Amino acid sequence: MSHNTFGHLFRVTTWGESHGPALGCVVDGCPPGLSFKLEDLQVWLDKRKPGQSRFVTQRREDDLVKVLSGVMLDADGETMTTTGTPISMLIENTDQRSKDYGEIARQYRPGHADYTYDLKYGIRDYRGGGRSSARETAARVAAGGIARLVVPGVTVRGALVQIGKHKIDRRNWDWDQVDQNPFFSPDAAIVPVWEEYLDGIRKNGSSIGAVIEVIAEGVPAGLGAPIYAKLDQDIAALLMSINAVKGVEIGNGFAAAETSGEDNADEMRMGNDGTPIFLSNHAGGILGGISTGQPVVARFAVKPTSSILTERQSIDAEGKNVDIRTKGRHDPCVGIRAVPIGEAMVACAVADHYLRDRGQTGRLK
């Protein structure tokens, strides 16, 4: 199985499976001389790790990241400085329950990658989904922690903006609220609504989809290139690579189809300091594939997890009809823990384009 690497200059390779002894990543292309502490990476993994509320999978993983290479430890015994060589990171799996998956070793769960993996490779790791499990994304979040160090002054933040048909009220948007509730919601008023709604979903053994919004502020103008190296193109590709993602939009996205040219185009004026300013940001901070200097705004939709308790029709590897009820521990809404994953993917895309722009134009922004 190839295609486990993404990026051009800031390259990330992830490895490992859901029920293996460990998983991790190798970050190649990180510039030398960047200093950080382990806690600077762990904070993002803690945001993604399972078992933190009744609304996510109850699998218990500490997700403690270990940095194995690519850094030198400073005299204080805590600060690490990148050397420019590959940074290898490892996260151990400690709470696997492979016995929950014995019955589906030869059966294809509807909505999962079981059938297509078997079809393509002739073999699949059925234990927790193996490589197709969202467990792999812990390594991406670790890589995203490194990516955040690369571009000075950039802040990447994400929030859950919709669960099922229940959307936030954007007039209530408050970033300070995001880490104060189990949903990463910027709207405190929607939290009790989501709690009641997801409790019902969870008790029925079902699942529901969601929409996540990621905003990168402080992105320098000029990142990205026309046609085949657009910044939004690469952001969309990385977000689409996340498990269960079925749609991505930048800026106004699909809503742009409902607006006129007058309403959609972001008008400009010269600011008092002699620099141009935009009067709106319908484009999501990107024009012609190149960043404008405005906040980069992306949203992505995740489908309901296919692991539900409802019995469903399928087939097995011998071509027989079977009825399947999924066992194991699963998220009733995978969108919750997708928030830090989306942040990591956007951070990696911005870091990669920052290094590519620096290499092409020679400008240090």
UniProtKB/Swiss-Prot annotation:
Gene: aroC
Similarity comment: family membership: Belongs to the chorismate synthase family.
SUPFAM superfamilies reported in the protein's UniProt record: Chorismate synthase, AroC
Coiled-coil stretches: none
Enzyme Commission (EC) number: 4.2.3.5
Protein name: Chorismate synthase
Quaternary structure and partners: Homotetramer.
Pathway annotation: Metabolic intermediate biosynthesis; chorismate biosynthesis; chorismate from D-erythrose 4-phosphate and phosphoenolpyruvate: step 7/7
Names of required cofactors: FMNH2
Keywords, comma-separated and alphabetical: Amino-acid biosynthesis, Aromatic amino acid biosynthesis, FAD, Flavoprotein, FMN, Lyase, NADP
PROSITE patterns in alphabetical order: CHORISMATE_SYNTHASE_1, CHORISMATE_SYNTHASE_3
GO process annotations (BP): amino acid biosynthetic process; aromatic amino acid family biosynthetic process; chorismate biosynthetic process
Species lineage: Bacteria, Pseudomonadati, Pseudomonadota, Alphaproteobacteria, Hyphomicrobiales
Organism of derivation: Rhizobium johnstonii (strain DSM 114642 / LMG 32736 / 3841) (Rhizobium leguminosarum bv. viciae)
Residue positions binding NADP(+): R48, R54
Pfam families: Chorismate_synt
Cofactor binding, note field: Reduced FMN (FMNH(2)).
MF GO annotations: chorismate synthase activity; FMN binding
Catalytic activity of the protein: 5-O-(1-carboxyvinyl)-3-phosphoshikimate = chorismate + phosphate
Protein task: This reaction introduces a second double bond into the aromatic ring system.
A cellular component term, taken from the record's GO annotations: cytosol
Binding positions (FMN): R131, S132, S133, N243, A244, G288, K303, P304, T305, S306, S307, R329
Cited InterPro entries: Chorismate_synth (IPR000453), Chorismate_synth_AroC_sf (IPR035904), Chorismate_synthase_CS (IPR020541)
